[in-house]
Amino acid sequence: MYRSMKSLALLGLLGPTSQVFAHPATGHAHNIGRRGVDIEAFRLPQVGSYTNATEIETTPPIALLKRESYVETATELVKKLAPNSEFRLVGDHYVGTNGIGHVNFKQTVHGLDIDNGDFNVNIGKDGKVFSYGNNFFKGEAPEASPLKKRDFKDPVSALKGAKDVLQLPVEAASASAEPKEGTEVYSIKGTSGTVSDPEARLVYFVKADGSLALSWRVETDITENWLLTYVDAETGTDVHGVVDYVSDLANYRVYPWGVNDPTEGDRVLVTDPWDISASPLTWQSDGTTNYTTTRGNNGIAQSNPSGGTAYLNNYRPTSAARNFDYQYTTSLTTPSSYIDASIAQLYYTANHYHDLLYTLGFTESAGNFQINNNGKGGVGNDFVVLFAQDGSGTNNANFLTPPDGSNGRMRMYLWTMSTPRRDCSFEAGVVIHEYTHGLSTRLTGGPANSNCLNALESGGMGEGWGDFFATAIRLKPTDTRATDYSMGAWVYNNPAGIRSVLYSTSMTTTPNTYSTINGVSSVHRIGETWATTLYEVLWNLIDKHGKNDGPRPEFDSNGVPTDGKYLTLKLVLDGMALQPCSPNFIQARDAILDADKALTGGDNLCELWTAFAKRGLGSNAVYSSSNRRDGFNVPAGVC
C-alpha cells in the first residue's frame, strides 16, 4: 500500500506579528490572553519532592520493602511514609518497557480528592522500591466533612465564577447542575460556548501558601483551551489555579522522516512506512475498519478551515488504492490547492512519531494515543485528531492532552512570515514538538493525570522536551557536537528560528545554565535552557556509543538502545515516567539518572552528570522558585 507524507506541527503560540521577531510567546492559553486575562498567573504551585534511587539505597527500611505485587509494595510505601493520610490508588499503574513499575496515588480527605495531592512510586525489576515522588499535603486536614454542613457554593456558581475571572466565552445564565456518578460530581446543562457540557467536581486544592482550600474543579472545553479551573467553594469567585490541557506550538512542514523541512530534502513516495511491532494494525486500520483515507488506529487527519472541533465529517483525501500521492511545491500561493498533500504529510509524521515513541516505551499501558489498545492495557479510544490548515489561528500550532481515554487534538496553522504563506504540517519539528506535549503530559504523574506539567518550571520543561526530541530526530550523519540547530526556522522564515537561542554545546554560542531561568516567566524561555541541557546529554552519549542514523533504534538483548541518540531519547522518556508530578529541573535530572540506573545499571552516569554539571545542574545545584543556584560539581567516584 502506498502513501505519501503526513506531518504535525509544534511550538507555542507566538503572539502578534510585531512581537514575533523579538520573542516567542510566553504562555499556553493565548486565546484567553486575547480576552485580556493572563492565564500564567493561575499556574499550579510547584510543590513536592523526588527521592531518587541512590537515596533509596541508603534508607534500608524502604530499600528492603517488598510485597507480593509491585502495586502492593507501592501501597505499603505510601502507608509508611504518610501514615496519617487518606489516599486512593489511581487505576493507571503499569510496568514500562524498562521493567520499572509505575504506581500513582491520589490523596483524599473525607472522601474528596486533594486534586494536586499526588504520590508516584516506581518499583524496580526486583520488586523493591526504586524511587518515588511525593506531592501529598502535609498540613492538618479539616476535622469535619464539608458534606455535612454543605455551606459551600453550588457548582453552577463556580462555573459562573470561572467564567467571570477568566472571561470565558461561555453563557451560563440558564445553567443547571445534574449529578453524575461519583461524590459531588455534576454535569452542567444549559450552557453555550463549550464543546461539551462543563463538569464540576468538589475537591480540595493545595494553594501556593501550603493551605488547603475546598474547591470546585470546573472543567470546560472551549475549543482553543480545555481548562480545569479550581474555584474556591466558599466564595465561588476566587480562582486558586488553572490547568490547560492545550499546549501551544509553532507550525512546521514535513517530508520523509529525518527531513525536517523543505530546505533539507525532496518529497518522496514511501511504501508501508509503519513499524508493525508498534502499529500491528498498520496505519490504515483500527482492527474493525480498513480505511482508504487518512484515518487509522493512531490518528485521523483532515482539513479544518472553520477552526471548529468537529472532525468526523471534515474533508480528508480518499484513495481506494491507499495511494496518497499529491502535488506540492513551496511556490504554491493558495493553501487550499495543496490541502491533500498537507493532510497526508501531517498524518505520516504523526504516525511515524507514534511508532518511534512506542519502541522507546510510550505504549498502550503507558497512556499512548490509540483507538484500539489490542488488549495491552491503558484505556484506548483516544487517537490524535489532526487538523491541517486549521482556521482558528495563524503563526502557531497547538496540542491538547486530556487524560488517557480522551482524544489528543493537534491544530496546525498557516504561517504568514513569508510570501507565499507556509503550512506548518510540512515542518516535522513542529509536529514532533507538538506531539511531545502529549508524551510528556501522559507520562508525568501517570496517564490518568494531565495536571502535572502546569507549574512554571514544569511547563518550561514541557516546551524543552518538545524542542529536544525534534532536534535529536533531525540530526544528520555528518553532524558533530559542534553542530548547532534552531527551531522553527522554515515556518518562521528566519534562520535563527523562533527561539532566542540556538541549541548548541558551545558555552559561547549558548551560555545558558540553570540559573539563567531565574526571573523568567516564559515557559518557552525556560524550555530553551532545559533543551540545551539535554542537547549536552545527547552528544555525551553519542560520543560514547555512536549514532544510529536510521529511523528506528536497535536494541541489545537487555532492551538497551545500542547507540547514543536513541539511548538518550529512551532515558529522557523513561525519566518522564519516573519523575514526580510538577517536577523541577533537579528532580527531572535525578529521574533521568535513575532511568539510566534502571536500564543500564548506571553505565552512563559519568556522561550524564558531566552534561548536567556543564549547564549548572551538577550535584550542588539548588532549586528555589526565585533563586536557583548553579552547581557545577560531578559526584565523587562517578567518573
Curated annotation (Swiss-Prot):
Keyword Zinc among UniProt keywords: yes
Signal peptide feature range: 1-22
Entry EC no(s): 3.4.24.-
Catalytic residues, chain numbering: 434
Induction / repression: Expression is controlled by the prtT transcription factor.
GO MF terms, alphabetically ordered: metalloendopeptidase activity; zinc ion binding
InterPro entries in the record: FTP_domain (IPR011096), Fungal_virulence_M36 (IPR050371), Peptidase_M36 (IPR001842), Peptidase_M4/M1_CTD_sf (IPR027268)
One protein family per Pfam: FTP
Glycosylation, residue list: 52, 290
GO cellular component: extracellular region
Location relative to the cell: Secreted
Top class in the EC scheme: hydrolase
Functional note: Secreted metalloproteinase that allows assimilation of proteinaceous substrates.
Protein name, entry field: Extracellular metalloproteinase mep
Originating species: Colletotrichum graminicola (strain M1.001 / M2 / FGSC 10212)
Gene label: mep
